[in-house]
């Protein structure tokens, strides 16, 4: 299967499909023509340019007032990529690095960056052959683009750095020799076009949004099972309630729960309690707010991944080369912080339902186990969930609220969007684990409602889950069961 890089809108759903299917990339004629046209314009412009052009004939950052001789312009770009590869910390997961390659190609394909066609084609070759550069999580301020991580992404183009290839971390020069690829000699502006961009942030955001859709759906399914296990009421999910407060996510969540629980014997039973705790009764409002946030963030990120985000921007048709700020990550840093909060809240309310299920209420045994005291049962999984939720709350401090000046004050406001991106991924992972622990608890609790049955949908999930995680009669080693639960919803 092949995906043609074009100027048609690239959606996150398309990205999800092409990554899952192992799709190959191919540069479309429209994109190829735009890249060639821009490079030819820039080459011609360089012949008689009468003024300094930032990053093309000058140094970078606060060194922008230093003019570089024509014979050194290629070396300038080579030096830029080498000197900016200053990332550190943990490495970025390979699937996100692959996303970075895709998004960098997409951004360069519009023909506003001045890169050589061979440079873009090599990025495509790397994507298609799963030659994935080693990129580090720390180092980007999220303005002037993701300089350090994109430098690591592009080092292999010039024969430097390391790559993941066939399960091994190797020197890119060795892999290049094996594949018969030659290092690329960068031309004027190319290094800046490669490094000035938001693809580190955007790739993390796209990956997180793909996971967010999955986790939001599981939050509803697991929440519905917990509602059944807790002998909760269906009335808070009636459509009349949500018609008078018409937030889309709230309406969708309530409708989803009604469908999930359709035909349940448990939900139809007469309830002796007047109302449920907020963690059950307010699921439509809380889960719905997260859905609305996911929807909004997706709309913003889809604009970003269909944009040219480097600097300066080259406009061949208008005979313009403009130094501006499309590299600044603020437009996506704030939404990523919002998404972090939205996903953290899914885990926050999930942990509260876990707590209720083990509290010995509504006919459920203490800690969901026979012989409490002799057995601790599901006591400690709730501790684990609480620990994870607390960590996620700490990660909800908006990275985009911070800014530290750099480059001798020339770059005096930055987005810190890369920090928003990496902590977003951490919260995605945390939320997945908390929801898995809730599923672990909910299936155990549901057993105590027998012989009554839940809905066909919930019972189907229950039956599939029981194939990998058994009912707990007496205390046992639970870590492997929690890990199996995580794998189940993954």
What is each PLM-predicted segment?
Residues 2-23, 27-34, 38-41, 46-49, ...:
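C-terminal auxiliary extensions adjacent to catalytic cores
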Residues 135-140, 317-321:
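Cysteine-centered functional microenvironments
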Residues 72-85, 356-366:
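Catalytic or ion-translocation cores adjacent to nucleophile or general acid/base/metal-coordination motifs
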Residues 112, 141-143, 373:
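Conserved, non-catalytic sequence blocks in retroelement Pol enzymes and Pol-derived host proteins
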Residues 72-75, 119, 212-214:
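Short, low-complexity, polar/charged sequence segments that are solvent-exposed and flexible
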Residues 54-68, 72-76, 83-108, 136-158, ...:
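FAD-binding core of FAD-dependent oxidoreductases
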Residues 2-50, 77-136, 227, 242:
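Glycine-rich, flexible loop motifs
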């Amino acid at each position: 299967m092949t995906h043609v890089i074009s100027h048609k809108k690239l959606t996150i759903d398309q990205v999800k499909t092409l990554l899952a299917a192992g799709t190959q990339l191919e540069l479309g004629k429209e994109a190829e023509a735009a890249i060639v046209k821009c490079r030819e314009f820039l080459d011609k412009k360089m012949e008689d340019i009468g003024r300094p052009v930032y990053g093309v004939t000058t140094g970078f950052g606060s060194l922008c007032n230093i003019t570089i001789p024509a014979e050194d312009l290629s070396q300038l770009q080579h030096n830029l990529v080498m000197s900016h590869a200053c990332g550190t910390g943990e490495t970025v997961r390979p699937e996100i690095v692959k996303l970075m390659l895709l998004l960098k190609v997409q951004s360069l394909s519009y023909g506003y960056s001045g890169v050589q066609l061979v440079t873009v084609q090599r990025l495509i070759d790397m994507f298609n052959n799963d030659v994935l550069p080693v990129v580090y999580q720390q180092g980007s301020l999220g303005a002037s683009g993701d300089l350090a991580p994109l430098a690591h992404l592009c080092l292999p183009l010039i024969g430097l750095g390391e790559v993941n290839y066939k399960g091994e971390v190797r020197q890119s020069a060795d892999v290049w020799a094996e594949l018969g690829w030659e290092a690329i000699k960068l031309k004027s502006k190319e290094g800046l076009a490669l490094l000035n961009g938001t693809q580190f942030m955007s790739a993390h955001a796209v990956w997180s949004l793909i996971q967010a859709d999955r986790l939001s759906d599981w939050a509803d399914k697991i929440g519905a099972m917990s509602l059944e296990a807790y002998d909760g009421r269906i009335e808070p999910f009636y459509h009349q309630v949500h018609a008078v407060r018409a937030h889309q996510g709230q309406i969708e969540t309530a409708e989803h729960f009604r469908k999930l629980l359709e035909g349940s014997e448990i939900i139809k039973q007469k309830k002796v309690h007047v109302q449920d705790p907020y963690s059950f009764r307010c699921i439509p409002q809380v889960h719905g707010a997260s859905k609305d946030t996911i929807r909004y963030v997706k709309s913003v990120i889809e604009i970003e991944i269909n944009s040219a985000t480097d600097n300066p921007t080259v406009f061949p048709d208008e005979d313009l080369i403009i130094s501006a700020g499309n590299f600044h990550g603020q437009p996506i840093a704030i939404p990523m912080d919002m998404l972090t909060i939205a996903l953290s809240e899914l885990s926050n309310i999930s942990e509260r339902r876990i707590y209720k299920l083990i509290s010995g209420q509504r006919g459920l045994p203490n800690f969901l186990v026979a012989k409490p005291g002799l057995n601790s049962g599901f006591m400690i999984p709730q501790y684990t969930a609480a620990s994870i939720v607390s960590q996620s709350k700490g990660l909800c401090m908006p990275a985009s609220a911070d800014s530290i000046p750099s480059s001798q004050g020339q770059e005096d406001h930055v987005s810190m969007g890369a920090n928003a991106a990496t902590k977003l991924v951490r919260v995605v992972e945390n939320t997945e684990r908390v929801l898995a622990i809730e599923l672990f608890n909910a299936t155990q609790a549901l057993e105590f409602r027998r012989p009554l049955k839940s809905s066909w949908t919930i019972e189907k999930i229950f039956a599939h889950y029981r194939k990998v995680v058994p009912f707990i009669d007496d205390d046992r080693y639970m870590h492997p069961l929690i890990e199996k639960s995580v794998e189940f919803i993954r």
